Amino acid sequence: MILFRLFTTLLCLSAFPLATTASADAPAPDGATCRYETLQVPALSLAGNKTGEATRQPVYVYLPPSYTESGTQRYPVLYFFAGYYESSDIAYLARGVEATLRQHEFIVVSINDVNSLHGTFGANSPVTGHWRDFFLTEAIPYIDAHYRTLATADGRAVGGFSMGGHVALRLAFEHPEIFATLYAVSPGVFDEHGLENAMKTWDQTFLNAYGAAYSPNLKKPFPHADYPSMDGSPEDLAIRAKWKKGFGELPQLIDAYLAQPVRLKAVALEVGMKDEYPWIPDGCVYLNDLLRTKGLAHTFVLTGNRHEFDAAIFEEGMGPFVARQFAKLAKPAAAAKAP
């Protein structure tokens, strides 16, 4: 499914319509407010890193208005990941998130994915720490233990922007047993020539973060990474293969996903036609074509946006899409012992 969204208008160009299931949740009363909480979550997966990352990491939680009124109801959760060099503190999305949560009952959780190099890429690295493990084995279980969540794949969505969109996409396709819904906005993904084109737009700061995540080498000086020379030498080609694997190797990712017994329930990709980094829309179009070729149902949204994510994009795109999927769930049963 390909959609064009220009400003607030949605134009469906596919024979397959969007799901029109309305939320089963009643809108919150006028004046009802969401609650925003900041946590410090144990992150032992990061122990021993070489970049000074703390073994407690911030996690930000938006609760719908009804959460404080009902002591037993459990809620589905959208896990969100921020872009490179951005804050994982999603207070800047307040208008869009709160408008969505006043209409639909789910929790939004932003797990920190930004480190001292300004981006983790959700990678397990001997340099920056095992961030993927932190997300999956520490942060999400912590949320399930401390909030009244629907701790099932159907009760979890994952989304993100740019680097965070890449994190969300990898998590979803690699772990459909944990997440059932994906919404990635301008994710970092490569087509066949993505690395070469992207290298033209990356500054040294980004190269350092990407290299430490995907081509770590503790024998090298800080930030302990190997960099491709792009000269075609055997050493360069070996390093380049590691760099391509980061945002690339999408056919391998999808083939590995198809080999699993579990399928995602809903997938959406959104990208702006005016993105300042042309390799990103090129990569998204490539991924869209790949998914279509593999017969995997998904929604592809082209907008008039630049490389950006704000409250309006959440309210008009990610929020409603996730809400439609959660609305298909049966009304959550009361929890016998709700945290």
Regions found by a protein language model. Name each.
Residues 1-3:
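N-terminal secretory signal peptides that target proteins for export/translocation
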Residues 6-17:
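Bacterial N-terminal signal peptides
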Residues 17-23:
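N-terminal signal peptide c-region/cleavage motif recognized by signal peptidases
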Residues 23-339:
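Non-catalytic cap/lid and distal C-terminal segments of serine-dependent acyl enzymes
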